[in-house]
Amino acid sequence: MISIGTDLVHISAFAEQLAQPGSSFMEVFSAGERRKANERQGSRYAEHLAGRWAAKESFIKAWSQAIYGQPPVIAEEAVVWRDIEVRADAWGRVAIELAPELAAVVRESIGEFSSSLSISHDGDYAVATCVLTIQ
């Protein structure tokens, strides 16, 4: 079985959310994701993180779609977003890496799976699609 999730992020609105005084939104990103974002300058910083946020959301949507007709395994407010990490290889190709505890919960709900991820940016938008292949 294949399950797909997609998310679209308006980069300007996302950047405003990041810049709000007292915002804890950066906590949804892992230390590695924040480190990579800090390598970007100006608007590229928010663009980079918007793509990562879209990727995390697309994973949750693909997982949710895989259990269609069943209640959610984790309430939305209980998701530890930094446990869904977007990593890039040496050539910039991205993948989702789950924290071990979250990976175990996902496997318990859908069985063994693999994921594929794509992130794209165009103008003021970032989009991500995650495909879960469930064995």
Curated annotation (Swiss-Prot):
Main function: Transfers the 4'-phosphopantetheine moiety from coenzyme A to a Ser of acyl-carrier-protein.
Alphabetical list of Pfam families matching this protein: ACPS (PF01648)
UniProt-annotated binding residues for Mg(2+): 7, 57
Originating gene: acpS
Gene Ontology MF, one: holo-[acyl-carrier-protein] synthase activity
Keywords carried by this UniProt record: Cytoplasm, Fatty acid biosynthesis, Fatty acid metabolism, Lipid biosynthesis, Lipid metabolism, Magnesium, Metal-binding, Transferase
Gene3D superfamilies documented for this protein: 4'-phosphopantetheinyl transferase domain
HAMAP family from the UniProt entry: AcpS
Subcellular location: Cytoplasm
Record protein name field: Holo-[acyl-carrier-protein] synthase
UniProt organism field: Corynebacterium glutamicum (strain R)
Catalyses which reaction(s): apo-[ACP] + CoA = holo-[ACP] + adenosine 3',5'-bisphosphate + H(+)
Keyword Protein transport among UniProt keywords: no
Cofactors required: Mg(2+)
